[in-house]
Design a protein with these regions (language model features):
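Acidic carboxylate motifs that coordinate Ca2+ or other divalent cations, activating on Asp/Glu
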Residues: 106
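Eukaryotic acidic, Ser/Thr-rich intrinsically disordered low-complexity regions
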Residues: 164-206
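HEAT/HEAT-like alpha-solenoid repeats
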Residues: 30-31, 75-76, 129-133, 193-205
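Strongly charged, low-complexity linkers/loops
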Residues: 127-146, 154
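Structural detector for internal amphipathic alpha-helices that build alpha-solenoid repeat scaffolds
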Residues: 5, 12-27, 36-37, 45-60, ...
Length: 206
């Protein structure tokens, strides 16, 4: 049975084992098969194992096809490629991620892009990345807001100044998001719900 056939089996546990085997015994011929499966694999655990298997291969071989996937029209292909690039952590992926994918209209892709950008940004780009991400404060639902806050917190201290600036925004939602993020910077273990609650309390009563 080929790797492609093994990854197409109906049993999720069998697909998981196939991905694990591909990472345990890396082979350059597996790379396009693993990447193609990332685009359509429905099971989260299997997708994580596909990422692990790709990370086990040399970055010089995986980076080019993963970067190509960032231009896919399929959102899962983009998000999985970003997730894998974040695990590889190679700065060579930076130009392909920022800034375009940071503003992806698909929230899952955007959230993964923020995390990947933090993981691969060269030191000289971190302050600029923080400034770019800060323009997105106020976006999305609870999970989106929390993901953006965690990304900005991971960029501290480079993100401190821009967060303090945005915390004075005339837009209440943006201001709360910035204030809550500053709380996460100060205490990464604070629950996001608590950070947002305390940030709202800090707003002046209108």
């Amino acid at each position: 049975m080929t790797l492609a056939e093994a990854l197409a089996q109906g049993d999720g546990s069998a697909r998981l084992q196939a991905a694990m085997d591909a990472g345990t015994r890396p082979d350059p011929s597996f790379i396009p098969v693993l990447i193609a499966r990332c685009e359509i694999e429905p099971d989260f655990s299997v997708r994580e194992m596909l990422t692990w298997a790709l990370v086990r291969h040399p970055a010089d071989l995986t980076l080019p096809p993963l970067i190509d996937e960032l231009g896919s029209e399929v959102s899962q292909a983009r998000s999985q490629a970003l997730h894998t690039l974040s695990k590889i952590g190679d700065e060579r992926a930076w130009p392909a991620i920022a800034p375009a994918l940071l503003f992806d209209s698909d929230d899952t892709v955007a959230r993964t892009a923020w995390r990947a950008a933090v993981a691969v940004a060269p030191e000289a780009e971190r302050a600029g990345l923080a400034a770019t991400l800060a323009t997105l404060l106020g976006r999305g639902d609870r999970d989106v807001r929390m993901s953006l806050a965690r990304a900005l917190a991971a960029l501290a201290p480079e993100s401190d100044a821009v967060l303090r600036q945005v915390a004075t925004s005339a837009d209440a939602a943006v201001r709360v998001h910035a204030l809550a993020t500053l709380r996460i910077v100060a205490d990464p273990d604070e629950a996001w719900e608590t950070a947002e609650f305390e940030a709202r309390k800090a707003l002046p009563i209108e």
